[in-house]
């Protein structure tokens, strides 16, 4: 209380960034194996902000049909074209990727662990297909971070594709201490772009 008072009276974009924000972002980046991280009030807010800020009419978002509702809502805010593939159907995903080669960015959008059924994304196969078609991979790992992988880093660790997933979102409200908050974790370039948007 002596150092920080009772807390910020609003979000950091209004009241400013404190050293504890950056410290947590650095620790999350180190844990997740990414270059940088940006904190949000919740993962729902992270998912709401990521697509609109990064993608335009020149791009396409290709989502697993069972992604979390917050991802669907976030995609709707973006001007990017939107498409879906049958749940965990890699042949259908490949058809979709091949059909959108005219787009600037092709982004495969998935959960790491699907919250309704508890099944895992076939992330190793998704990443391989994305690399074949020069596409990006977005994973909401809210239900995997802290649980999946040898050291709890999430579905990208579990499937052996750490460093090959372009954008991770997640929550601090589950395995990571039960606090509130969410994050986007990615390359330094992507996170700096998001900070400026």
Q: Across the structure, where does each feature detected by a protein language model lie?
A:
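Short, structured coil segments at secondary-structure junctions
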Residues: 57, 77-79, 133, 164
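Conserved Walker B
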Residues: 66, 113, 141-143
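Active-site C-terminal subdomain of aminotransferase-like
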Residues: 133-136, 143, 148-197
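Active-site phosphate-binding strand-loop segment of PLP-dependent enzymes
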Residues: 83, 87-139
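Conserved PLP-anchoring active-site segment centered on the Schiff-base-forming lysine
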Residues: 50-69
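Conserved N-terminal alpha-helix of the aminotransferase class I/II PLP-enzyme fold
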Residues: 3-42
């Amino acid at each position: 209380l002596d150092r920080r008072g009772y807390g910020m009276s609003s979000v950091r974009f209004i009241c400013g960034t404190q050293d504890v924000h950056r410290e947590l972002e650095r620790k999350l980046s180190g844990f997740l194996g990414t270059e940088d991280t940006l904190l949000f009030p919740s993962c729902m807010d992270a998912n709401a902000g990521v697509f609109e800020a990064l993608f335009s009419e020149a791009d396409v978002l290709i989502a697993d049909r069972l992604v979390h509702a917050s991802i669907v809502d976030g995609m709707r805010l973006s001007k990017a074209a939107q498409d879906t593939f049958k749940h965990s159907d890699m042949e259908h995903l490949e058809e979709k990727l091949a059909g959108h080669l005219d787009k600037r960015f092709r982004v495969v959008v998935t959960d790491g662990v699907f919250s309704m059924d508890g099944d895992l994304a076939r992330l190793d196969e998704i990443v391989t297909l994305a690399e074949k078609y020069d596409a990006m991979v977005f994973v909401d790992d809210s239900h995997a971070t802290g649980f999946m992988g040898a050291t709890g880093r999430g579905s990208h660790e579990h499937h052996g594709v750490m460093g090959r997933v372009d954008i991770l979102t997640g929550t601090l409200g589950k395995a990571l201490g039960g606090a509130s908050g969410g994050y986007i974790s990615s390359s330094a370039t992507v996170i700096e772009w998001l900070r400026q948007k």
